[in-house]
């Protein structure tokens, strides 16, 4: 469950380390973001020489949440952290690598490029 002001780890090599959610996209009444949702965020921490700088406003897709969520088969899944991947035009990732596992729900939401770059899909 990601809402405005939530801080997330960045799980790619764009140079951003931490972002803060500004808005969950998808209508005026969307309060929380789940895995696969797109958010608008501000870069709060970045490495020098990266693609993005501190203060940049970026779009990102949520790939992991610490709050568990149910799947249609009755199982539940949760992760150790809240993490996102920065995306650009046409929802393609801005980085060339993704760190850590990603959820299977990203495949259903058509983020195939992120799924293919991920080391593990849970």
UniProtKB/Swiss-Prot annotation:
Swiss-Prot/TrEMBL keywords: Ribonucleoprotein, Ribosomal protein, RNA-binding, rRNA-binding
Pfam family, one: Ribosomal_L14
UniProt-listed CDD domains: Ribosomal_uL14
UniProt cross-references to InterPro entries, sorted A to Z: Ribosomal_uL14, Ribosomal_uL14_bac-type, Ribosomal_uL14_CS, Ribosomal_uL14_sf
GO BP terms: translation
GO cellular component labels: cytosolic large ribosomal subunit
UniProt GO MF annotations: large ribosomal subunit rRNA binding; structural constituent of ribosome
PANTHER family xref list: 50S/60S RIBOSOMAL PROTEIN L14/L23 (PTHR11761), LARGE RIBOSOMAL SUBUNIT PROTEIN UL14M (PTHR11761:SF3)
HAMAP family assigned to the protein according to its UniProt record, in alphabetical order: Ribosomal_uL14 (MF_01367)
Self-association and partners: Part of the 50S ribosomal subunit. Forms a cluster with proteins L3 and L19. In the 70S ribosome, L14 and L19 interact and together make contacts with the 16S rRNA in bridges B5 and B8.
Job of this protein: Binds to 23S rRNA. Forms part of two intersubunit bridges in the 70S ribosome.
Family membership: Belongs to the universal ribosomal protein uL14 family.
Name used for this protein in its record: Large ribosomal subunit protein uL14
Organism (species): Chloroflexus aggregans (strain MD-66 / DSM 9485)
Lineage, uppermost ranks: Bacteria, Bacillati, Chloroflexota, Chloroflexia, Chloroflexales
Gene that this sequence comes from: rplN
């Amino acid at each position: 469950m990601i809402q405005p002001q939530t801080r997330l780890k960045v799980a790619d090599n764009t140079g951003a380390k931490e972002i803060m959610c500004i808005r969950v996209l998808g209508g005026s009444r969307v309060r929380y973001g789940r895995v696969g949702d797109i958010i608008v965020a501000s870069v709060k921490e970045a490495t020098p020489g990266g693609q993005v700088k501190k203060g940049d406003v970026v779009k990102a897709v949520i790939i992991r949440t610490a709050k568990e969520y149910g799947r249609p088969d009755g199982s539940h899944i949760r992760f150790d952290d809240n993490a996102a991947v920065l995306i650009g035009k046409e929802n393609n990732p801005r980085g060339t690598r993704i760190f850590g596992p990603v959820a299977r729900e990203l495949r259903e939401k058509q983020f195939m490029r992120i799924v293919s770059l991920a080391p593990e899909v849970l």
